[in-house]
């Protein structure tokens, strides 16, 4: 084996030479890379996770602030605005807001309805909102400038009293009609009471805040929330317009010259629900621009209102159509993108006259890319913190990495680093993952599916092996730093883990030498177990395995331990029982070139091997003679340098010396 070939194909560069002892380095590395410091986290229940997702949209603490997990507020009689129970109270009030919005307009248009049961219901509803006013003085709030949760009683009360919300809350909660009846003994039937009741529409802001929060809550479907919001807006607008239309007709001086009086002459004496039905019917017909003609504006007041009503309907209809179009189109964007990508592939293959096999592979890969879009971790995890991404990778791929032969016996810290940097990919059937003779940039661990190891024989191909989940592909080219010796092709839909060459090399070289030795030991054991067909495809593999066995043999037989400097060399061997043996010797491993002939400057030149053999210098002269006999095919008795000087001590030799053994 030539010098260049041995240097390029030797896996020994992965063995790190340290200036300090392996024991000290291992201890320091273990301390620095303790898995407990990396993976230690507090487990959260599903309830905790739900609380986090609900709080995150409304509570944004400033940097450097700390909020306790159990009770962020240590002050008594304080209700946290993001507390789950307070959220339920707000939801209950939203239901009452819906009634208030309907009743205030209904009582304005139909005065007779405000005297009956609705008056009692209004009092009950106002009572709950009065309780909420008192409760607001004890509810924390989020400071918009510091983003801190304020729990001070004085600050909460001062902020609420100085706000417009306090004045409007009190005004919309006062039961003015009931107070008037209590004082005067007469039921207030004037229009003033109806308009004062419209102050209750101020409560609609609670509905807007609820939808704003639900749209950002991951527990609810965004499409459904937006549709419900549009439906509520439409129903409220129909109810508002219908009540105003009836109020205009009811208070017009000539009842028969109104839109409803022309159809029902005595509509004022008829049932309230009859008038409400007519009002809703005409409001819906006008909103939808159907216009049957059975109901129409008669007097100038109704015509004026209808003009503004239809103008507003144009904007409302445009808003609803725009929102619905956006929601529907958003769901079809992925399909449109896939169709566009497929059309681009078809045009490209047709223009460049690519064969059908390549076209089918490109189409299959593109379709698989869109089908597995939700499973590809890069797009899902790219915006997450590194710690969360690492935890997800540990959960998904830790077990499969531990089963791979190359990483068996790996320390915890190195496994954490490796799993944190891997990437998962999907490949459709009959897709080449690795091409023969390509540059070894990555190697793969098969998670699911299966692949074939293929060697090209001219125009034909030969399947050398079939690999399943847990197997590795492409690692031979990466470790030896040679062009990939085989083609790797999927048999069916396969998920693989891709590990980059440079990242793997940097990670191993930055760790202690014990980890590198473990990789080499596992790798050499795997190479010895390859079938003969695979070994034939790697010409230098047999010589490399023989050299490794010879080095182990020399290390076992060596009794000398020369000291040269502070560096330490560790030799690893794996016994048949699976145990790994480590032997240490001081000094940098020296590589020398041996020749089976006398030095060329002497008269008695032999016709031996002029190219020489590159070997690692053993520990003694006797072992050097034994190794030379095995490599050169003949045993010598003398060792000389190129200048003819005889070698008597092994320590006198230097790196890349030419030794002539004869």
UniProtKB/Swiss-Prot annotation:
Q: In which tissues is it expressed?
A: Expressed predominantly in root hairs and root endodermis and, at a lower level, in leaf nodes, trichomes, and hydathodes.
Outline the inducing conditions. Answer: Strongly reduced in roots after 2,4-dichlorophenoxyacetic acid (2,4-D) treatment and after benzyladenine (BA) treatment. Strongly induced in shoots after NaCl treatment.
Give the GO biological process terms: potassium ion transmembrane transport; response to nematode
Provide the leader sequence positions.
none
The annotated topology with respect to the bilayer is:
Multi-pass membrane protein
Domain KHA, first and last residues per copy: 591-662
Intramembrane bits: 278-297
Q: Which GO terms describe its cellular component?
A: endoplasmic reticulum; monoatomic ion channel complex; plasma membrane
Answer whether the UniProt record assigns the keyword Cell inner membrane to this protein. no
Residue ranges in the Extracellular topological domain are 112-118, 185-194, 251-277, 298-301
Q: Which Pfam families match?
A: cNMP_binding, Ion_trans, KHA
Q: Which InterPro entries match?
A: cNMP-bd_dom (IPR000595), cNMP-bd_dom_sf (IPR018490), Ion_trans_dom (IPR005821), K_chnl_volt-dep_EAG/ELK/ERG (IPR003938), KAT/AKT (IPR045319), KHA_dom (IPR021789), RmlC-like_jellyroll (IPR014710)
Q: Which UniProt keywords apply?
A: Coiled coil, Ion channel, Ion transport, Membrane, Potassium, Potassium channel, Potassium transport, Transmembrane, Transmembrane helix, Transport, Voltage-gated channel
**Where do the TM regions start and end?**
91-111, 119-139, 164-184, 195-215, 230-250, 302-322
* All ranges on the Cytoplasmic side of the membrane: 1-90, 140-163, 216-229, 323-662
The listed locations are: Membrane
Which family would the database say this protein is a member of? Belongs to the potassium channel family. Plant (TC 1.A.1.4) subfamily.
Recorded protein name is Potassium channel KAT3
Q: Please name the source species.
A: Arabidopsis thaliana
């Amino acid at each position: 084996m030539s010098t260049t070939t041995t240097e390029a194909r030797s896996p020994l560069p992965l063995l790190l030479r340290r200036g300090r002892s392996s024991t000290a380095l291992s201890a320091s590395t273990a301390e620095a890379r303790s898995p407990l410091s990396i993976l230690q986290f507090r487990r959260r229940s599903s309830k905790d996770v739900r609380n986090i997702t609900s709080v995150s949209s409304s509570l944004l603490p400033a940097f450097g602030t700390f909020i306790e997990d159990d009770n962020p507020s240590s002050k008594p009689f304080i209700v946290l605005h993001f507390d789950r129970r307070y959220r339920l109270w707000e939801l209950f009030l939203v239901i009452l807001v819906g009634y208030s919005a309907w009743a205030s307009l209904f009582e304005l248009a139909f005065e007779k309805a405000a005297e009956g049961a609705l008056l009692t219901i209004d009092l009950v509803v106002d009572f709950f909102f009065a309780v909420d006013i008192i409760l607001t003085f004890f509810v924390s709030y989020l400071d918009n400038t510091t983003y801190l949760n304020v729990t001070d009683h004085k600050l909460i009360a001062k902020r609420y009293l100085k706000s417009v919300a306090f004045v409007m809350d009190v005004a919309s909660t006062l039961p003015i009609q009931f107070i008037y009846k209590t004082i005067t003994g007469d039921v207030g039937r004037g229009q003033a009471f109806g308009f004062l009741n419209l102050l209750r529409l101020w409560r609609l802001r609670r509905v807007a805040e609820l939808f704003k929060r639900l749209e950002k809550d991951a527990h609810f479907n965004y499409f459904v929330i937006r549709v419900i919001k549009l439906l509520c807006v439409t129903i409220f607008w129909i109810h508002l317009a219908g009540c105003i239309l009836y109020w205009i007709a009811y208070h017009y001086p000539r009842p028969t010259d109104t839109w409803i009086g022309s159809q029902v002459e005595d509509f004022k004496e008829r049932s309230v629900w009859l008038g409400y039905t007519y009002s809703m019917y005409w409001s819906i017909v006008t909103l939808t621009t159907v216009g049957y003609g059975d109901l129409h504006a008669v007097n100038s007041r109704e015509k004026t209102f209808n003009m503004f009503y239809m103008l507003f309907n144009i904007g409302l209809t445009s808003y609803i159509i725009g929102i619905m179009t956006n929601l529907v189109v958003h769901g079809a964007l992925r399909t449109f993108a896939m169709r566009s990508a497929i059309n681009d592939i078809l045009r490209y293959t047709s223009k460049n006259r690519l064969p059908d096999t390549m076209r089918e592979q490109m189409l299959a890969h593109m379709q698989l890319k869109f089908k597995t879009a939700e499973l590809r971790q890069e797009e899902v995890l790219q915006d997450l913190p590194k710690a969360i991404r690492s935890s997800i990778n540990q959960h998904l791929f830790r077990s499969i990495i531990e089963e791979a032969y190359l990483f068996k016996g790996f320390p915890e810290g190195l496994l954490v680093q490796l799993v944190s940097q891997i990437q998962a990919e999907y490949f459709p059937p009959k897709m080449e993952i690795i091409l023969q003779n390509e540059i070894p940039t990555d190697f793969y661990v098969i998670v699911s599916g299966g692949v074939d190891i293929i060697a090209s024989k001219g125009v034909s191909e030969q399947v050398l092996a079939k690999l399943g989940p847990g197997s590795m592909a492409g690692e031979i080219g990466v470790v030896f730093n040679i062009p990939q010796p085989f083609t790797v092709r999927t048999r069916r839909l396969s998920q693989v883990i891709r590990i980059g060459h440079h990242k793997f090399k940097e990670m191993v070289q930055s760790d202690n030498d014990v980890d590198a030795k473990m990789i080499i030991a596992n790798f050499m054991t795997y190479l010895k177990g390859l079938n003969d067909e695979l070994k034939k495809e790697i010409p230098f593999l047999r010589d490399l395995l023989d050299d490794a066995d010879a080095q182990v043999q020399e290390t076992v037989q060596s009794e000398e331990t020369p000291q040269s400097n502070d560096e330490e060399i560790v030799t690893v061997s794996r016994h048949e029982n699976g145990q790994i043996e480590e032997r240490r010797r001081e000094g940098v491993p020296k590589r020398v070139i041996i020749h089976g002939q006398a030095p060329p400057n002497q008269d008695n030149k032999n016709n031996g091997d002029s190219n020489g053999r590159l070997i690692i210098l053993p520990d003694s002269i006797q072992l050097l003679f034994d190794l030379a006999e095995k490599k050169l095919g003949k045993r010598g008795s003398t060792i000389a340098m190129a200048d003819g000087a005889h070698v008597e001590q092994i320590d006198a030799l230097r790196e890349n010396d030419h030794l002539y053994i004869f």
